[in-house]
């Protein structure tokens, strides 16, 4: 793995030198002129092919994984920062936030990142479905039961899966310890509907990726976690890295939770300069601190990697696109020193 990482970083440095000037222009220029600037793949196809080979081998090796949620709401892109093809090559999994009606450029970008060994998935969130249902009931636009609504939404959203390499299923819910018997039975009923649909899909698509996101300790007699590649803990709103360990301990204390696949969630900094909280632990960047946390030893569970919210925000740095995401990846999976 060390040699593969070394080769990846050497060739990646060459790519950076070729693209750095065009990246700076992204701050002000729109994509209304198609200028065909040869990249390294055209200038030295053999070197690029070797780079891709090493990159794919690295992603198939034992390393700290990196998930990233990408806001693909813009269907007429005016910046390279709106293309997943320009996300860091070392990302393992990119989750598209808007999986329906993918544009042609998005499908092309997906093929580009596939060549780099990156999987492209999307997220189905129980909590989001429940929130939308509650809002529609208040507005008077939904009169049916939540059972029926949930089943319908699962059918619709699982229908997007054909375009993707897998899915992330999010469930936060509430802790059953504090529920009455009636509340617990209702929560389990909804969990059964949600996860049985996911398991049916997974059984028919054994080769596709399934990952859990949320609070595993809130699951009631569910076996979904054994089918999940990773468990992404809902830590994106914590205020310091010590709380990452607390969330991991809470998860591992629950019955039936595999402890060899914990990934912690973190956000990039906001594009709103006045927002000094999103993406920070105090005055420190949460992304950097969480990356260091994954490298520390732990007793009883595995710190498997990071999941990054709003990854596209980090594209817009004056000195280096995706500066802090790349730094975090290098902290977790450093290139070997000579």
Tell me what each language-model feature is.
Residues 1-61:
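Bacterial Sec-dependent N-terminal signal peptides
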Residues 60-251, 257-282, 301-303, 307, ...:
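Chitinase-like catalytic core of GlcNAc-active glycosidases
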